[in-house]
Amino acid sequence: MHLGTESSISPNNWEWMARPTAPAVGNMPFQINQTVQEAPCVPLLSHSDVASYIETIVNPKSTARPRFDCPAINVRRYQHLQPHPKFFEKTKFHYMFALDLRDEGVELLPRLLASVIEAMRFLGPSYCALSLVGGGGTPDGVYDVLQALRPKIEGMGAKYYLRHPAIYPGTEGEDRIMNLARLRNLVLAPLTNPSPQDSGRYTTETTIIFINDVAICTEDILELVHQRKVQDADMTCAMDYIFEGTFYDIWVSRTLAGDTFFRVPHNGSWEFSGQLLPNSSDALSRERFDARRPFQVFACWNGAVAFHAAPLFRTAIRPGISWSSDVADPRHKADPVRFRRNMEQDGECYMGEPTLFAKDLWYRGFGKIAAVPSVALSYTMSDGEKIKKVKGFVSDVVGDKGPELDETPIPERISWQLTPPKEVLCARTWQTQKWVPWDQSLHETSEKN
């Protein structure tokens, strides 16, 4: 989850990532799809600048805008992801690409969106939908490019959704996590609350590919989807880095033992960031990480994820609540999963919305969540290129292997643990770290209802 810019980051200046925000109003973290006002749209880029971005995004050979090169698609490995017309209706969306960009980096678009478009072309545009939310950050012309991209996407035969909401996560006095959750839910709204013309086009078999503002290659996207499918995972996550190799999403991600991916002492220092997965309880995860094998976690996001839509389609047993409802209560297992903030009045730990999303998945029995170390991402074009040199591209890790899982020397197949850890580390701030029951507030409240 990208919460800042490179210039504002230093290894000892990360307390802001876990700082408390304004107290939540009320106790309804699940009413988050309410009507959203669109932000004013003032063009920031010239027509020629927009044209150069579009040219670079849709034309793989274009050099109109700078970007690093990515490997060609390993067709043999990923061909099984292409829906076969004999078995899949063309009226159904098999893939939904969900991007929450928030105007944080127009310079990323020639790499990010070019990779998304190449993935859609490979998977079959008619089976794909692209939903974007642009706006809410420092304006630099992202929305100008996204608007101009519409005819290109629709011309491919894919569905295109674009919103520019007046939701600003950094607004003083507002709950940051609540606003981030609202943005993520807005990206998913075409699926969770479809228009009449799209009703029935999304199914429990739809795979959602949710990408933050990262420098990503097409093979990164396809590998996440591939691992989700071959591992029978509920969700797969990338690994994101800064400083040419420091793991980034420390506040959000939790290991299968419920701990952070590296130790952050109470003073907030990142002095132990070089010691990833250090605990004996995470020894298997560390072994698999070192071997660049996917490993199971309690929670992750790390810049990009792939998850199946089934948890979003849960059919509620309570009157008036359906899978497409704007109201989803995390305490009711029959309700669909949505991004949310913590239930403050019930004493639930203040966590990032992706952590709570994973927690709610576990609560509903969707705990097969894995991080995929072969997919290494970063948040600027230059850092993205650097991290590929340090960690390698996906193809550097998997070679020319096909879709079959490699069983030597360490099995690629995950042996899934179906029970969550008893406790998870809560870090509202690094100074106030404590261990809490993994289902805190959910379990207690569910007994009362």
Regions found by a protein language model. Give the residues of each.
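N-proximal low-complexity "stem/linker" segments adjacent to membrane-targeting elements
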Residues: M1-E118
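Active-site donor/metal-binding and catalytic loop motifs
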Residues: I9-N12, R364-K388, D400-K401
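A Trp-anchored, charged/polar loop motif used as the substrate-binding/catalytic surface
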Residues: A72-Q82, R184-N193, P278-R293
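Phosphate/oxyanion-binding active-site loops and adjacent basic polyanion-contact surfaces
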Residues: R102-L112, T138-V142, D175-R184, C349-E353
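Short, acidic, metal-binding catalytic loop of nucleotide-sugar glycosyltransferases
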Residues: A114-Y127, K152
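Active-site-proximal specificity loops/subdomain of glycosyltransferases
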Residues: L130-T206, I211
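Conserved catalytic core of nucleotide-sugar-dependent glycosyltransferases
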Residues: V214-A328, K401-P421, L425-S441
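Catalytic donor-sugar/metal-binding loop of nucleotide-sugar-dependent glycosyltransferases
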Residues: P294-Q296, G303-V305, A309-R314, R318-W323, ...
